[in-house]
Design a protein with these regions (language model features):
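Solvent-exposed edge beta-strands and adjacent loop segments
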Residues: 1-68, 105-130, 135-143, 150-220, ...
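Charged, amphipathic alpha-helical segments and their flanking helix caps
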Residues: 2-3, 89-93, 100, 142-161, ...
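Extended, low-complexity, intrinsically disordered tandem-repeat tracts enriched
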Residues: 63, 86-90, 131, 214, ...
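Short, acidic/charged, Gly/Pro-enriched secondary-structure junctions
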Residues: 68-113, 227-266
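Short beta-strand-to-coil "C-cap" segments at the C-terminal boundary of structured domains/repeats
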Residues: 133-139, 293-301
Length: 301
């Protein structure tokens, strides 16, 4: 019988519970193992083929999952620049979580170096995680302590919105918004030296950047329409032209038009880095707004 995808899981070591736990609500995962090579062919070799020699090894893991309540924890983790202990293994078909200690199971240290949170209208909110290895991979020699996780709660994308303005407590959403994405990237540099044992690359974090993007509908005659109770293409263009330092919050929302601010997921300051208007024939006009994060963001209220 062939292994089904739901029974190949990525587990993260929980330092509080001192146990490995599966990444919750995952929909897919990928493990990449890379051998970096250098051509060792010389003038002494007969023929025209290269002779690749392995100079180092690298590995990475990516996970797609529904965006559950651990979004704040992931936002905190990536900017803490602290490596995780990861493991991948086959899991039991009874719960898709209990490990089977497959011969290909491995564990190692890795940085969460890329995080994307997506909150799109009428879609399940989702997140993408990218981990880059910073240690050798180890085979399992003893049975690691593991724990199962309960199914997490997730929400539809329309119930999370971006609030943005030039005041420190932004109260206006982007009117007519369709999509919202927050992307955080941790910069890594190779810290491998002649003193490093083995062949696996070692990484060192140097800093992080983040950006926010949104797509929204353009309202006809919006510049002369009465109050639309939200930021529009016109107001955002004014902020862009003034090079205004903006304040933003991504928060849960409720109410008839999903504009009543609830719990804040994260917040910070930004600059409007680009605005692109999309106007195709016989299609609704939209515009894309990109925000470049300014300074550290905060998690929670």
């Amino acid at each position: 019988m062939r292994l089904k995808g739901q029974n190949f899981r990525i587990l993260v070591y929980d330092t509080t519970a001192t146990k490995f736990k599966c990444i919750g609500m995952a929909t897919s995962c990928t493990v990449n193992l890379t051998a970096n090579t250098d051509d060792a062919s010389t003038k002494d070799d007969v023929g025209g083929s290269a002779k690749p020699e392995v100079t180092s090894n690298a590995w990475s893991v990516s996970v797609e999952s529904l965006n559950v309540v651990d979004a704040g924890a992931m936002l905190t983790a990536i900017k803490s620049m602290t490596p995780f202990t990861l493991m991948w293994d086959e899991t039991s078909t009874t719960d898709n979580q209990s490990i089977e200690e497959a011969s290909y199971a491995r564990k190692g240290q890795a940085y969460l170096n890329d995080l994307t949170l997506n909150f799109n209208d009428r879609e399940n909110s989702a997140k993408s995680l990218q981990f880059t290895g910073t240690s050798a991979l180890e085979k399992l020699t003893t049975t690691p302590s593991t724990d199962t996780i309960a199914a997490g709660s997730y929400t539809k994308g329309q119930f999370v919105r971006l609030f943005i303005s030039d005041s420190s407590n932004p109260a206006l959403v982007i009117a007519g918004a369709k999509t919202l994405s927050l992307h955080v990237s941790l910069s890594l540099e190779s810290a491998t030296t002649k003193d490093t044992p083995g062949t696996f690359d070692v990484q060192e974090p140097t800093g992080y950047t983040y950006d926010i993007s949104s797509n929204a509908l353009v309202a006809s005659n919006e510049t002369i329409t009465s109050n639309v109770d939200g930021q529009t293409l016109a107001t955002l263009m004014d902020f862009y032209e003034a090079s205004t330092l903006m304040y933003w919050q991504i928060a849960n929302v409720s109410g008839a038009n999903q504009r009543t601010k609830g719990a804040v997921i994260c917040s910070g300051q930004c600059r409007i880095s680009s605005i692109a208007v999309n106007a195709a024939n016989r299609q609704v006009a939209t515009y894309d707004t990109s925000l470049a994060g300014y300074g550290d963001y905060s998690v929670g209220s």
